[in-house]
Amino acid sequence: MKPPFDQFDHQIIQILHKDARTSASEIARLLNANERTIRKRIDRLVKLGAVRLTAIVDPEAFGYVTAVDIFLEVEPEHEDEVIQTFLTTPEVSYVALGQGNRDLSIECRFKTNDDMREFLRKKLPAISGGTVRGYSLVPRIIRNIDAWMPRDDDFRAETNNEEDI
């Protein structure tokens, strides 16, 4: 299946990736395009789920300097309730369901090592239906999800004219 995105979409995404506050008029100026076309393209990219225009919060700016990846095995009959618990747990910044003996992965953020220790020793064991299989202190994140971009060949669709947008 041919990707539904073309090189023009790629250029728009690259500009927004660099600075999501870039206005449609500025993108139009940079790409020598009509502002209306840019607005329609951005709306289409959002509607298709290709981009989300949101503020990304830096945990360290708020004092959350300790990150821990935690891997859990979850009893199938408790999967939904364990996931819901983590979705409402303020320390948890990421929840992913996987396959294998470590079928739930969470990332947690803490201001101090004492906060982390309290979570690992008291709060986490109190959650029924899951067993911690391992965890890893993350002293430095080299590349975060907000830095990821699709490959160039993901933008191979024919350039759409304005009526097709």
Annotate each predicted stretch with a short phrase.
Residues 1-165:
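A compositional/biophysical signature of low hydrophobicity enriched in polar/charged and small residues
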